[in-house]
Design a protein with these regions (language model features):
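Extracytoplasmic
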Residues: 18-21, 126, 140-144, 220-222
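Peptidyl-prolyl cis-trans isomerase
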Residues: 158-200, 238-239
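N-terminal targeting/tethering segments
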Residues: 14-105
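Acidic/polar surface patches and capping/hinge elements
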Residues: 115-144
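C-terminal soluble interaction/assembly domains
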Residues: 225-241
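Soluble non-cytosolic domains of exported or imported proteins
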Residues: 42-56, 68-72, 83, 101-111, ...
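Short, low-structural-confidence N-terminal segments
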Residues: 1-53, 150-151, 164, 189-193, ...
Length: 296
């Protein structure tokens, strides 16, 4: 339901008092019908629930993280994304129902929410137990040639040629110079199956042909790995504490139950109350998820 249609459903509103009618109240602030109209003009393609959620999030997260997410930070992020997309930026925004003018406030809300999530992770998730769990599967940086082929036959032929003799190995390394990469177990650019095989290799060793199917495209690739410089993590977990924290951070950012719990925490902290019955279930996806996870 989009803003224009939903606003008609607001109950008990005459033309004279509808603009000042409260939709959502919270500590020290409120969201009125007039605020929703204003937001709908800026984001005409966004569903009403999304508009109201973002209005609420912007207000409650600004209280705690407004000083962290500055206008300069937002502008820098917007520029970075714009540069990344180049000439496709406008069309990418259109697909999301955004314009260049509305993208900045949209990004600000996203960054405020991210700041709240990251704060909660830092305060509650970097425990000894979580660090030890991350440590179990962590492998530090290695450097290797990681070469992919589109068929198993091509990969097998390339591997056989590389392993045949020193000349074959030298030719393999010269041909695939751009495929020489440094990665660890947190890297997203190297498939998990390839990492698992690579971490078992000694310097100068080749892997067998490794099959990996992309979860995003469904395409299967066939990899060959030659280890250049392996590493051992040893027994000192503290040496890699920052890397392990990043493992935990990435995991929690992708955990929808955790993220919903963070949002629910701030909704409760700010006593956010939906006054208009048409939007009674506006935040249920966060509060119900939080309740179910805490009761387990």
């Amino acid at each position: 339901v989009f803003a224009g249609a939903a606003l008609v459903t607001l109950s008990g509103c005459s033309s004279s008092d509808s603009a000042s009618k409260d939709i959502i109240t919270m500590k020290g602030d409120t969201i009125r019908v007039s605020d929703l109209y204003k937001e709908a003009k800026q984001f005409p393609s966004q569903p009403t629930n999304t508009l109201l959620q973002n209005l609420t999030f912007d207000k409650i997260f600004t209280k705690d993280f407004g000083k962290e997410v500055t206008d300069k930070d937002v502008s820098k992020k917007v520029k970075s994304i714009k540069d990344q997309y180049g000439s496709q930026f406008s069309s990418a925004l259109q697909q999301q129902g955004l314009t260049e003018a509305s993208f900045t406030p949209y990004m600000r809300t996203q960054m405020l929410e991210q700041a709240a999530i990251d704060h909660e992770i830092k305060e509650t998730q970097y425990t000894d137990a979580n660090l030890k769990k991350a440590w179990e599967s962590y492998h530090p940086d290695v450097t290797a040639y990681v070469v992919s082929e589109t068929s198993k036959d091509a990969a097998t032929k390339a591997l056989d040629a590389a392993k045949k003799d020193d000349a074959g190995k030298a030719s393999f390394e010269k041909t695939n110079a751009e495929s020489k990469v440094t990665f660890n177990s947190t890297s997203t650019s190297v498939p998990t199956e390839v990492q698992t095989a690579a971490f078992k290799l000694k310097n100068g060793e080749f892997s067998d042909v490794i099959e990996s199917t992309s979860s995003s495209t469904g395409a299967t690739s066939y990899y060959i790995v030659e280890m250049v410089k392996t590493s051992e993590k040893g027994t000192d977990m503290n040496k890699y504490k920052k890397e392990l924290q990043n493992v935990i951070k990435t995991e929690k950012e992708q955990d929808t139950t955790f993220v919903s719990g963070v949002i629910a925490k701030y909704l409760k902290k700010n006593n956010v109350t939906v006054k208009e019955s048409a939007f009674a279930s506006l935040f249920s996806q966060f509060t119900q998820t939080s309740s179910s996870s805490s009761s387990k």
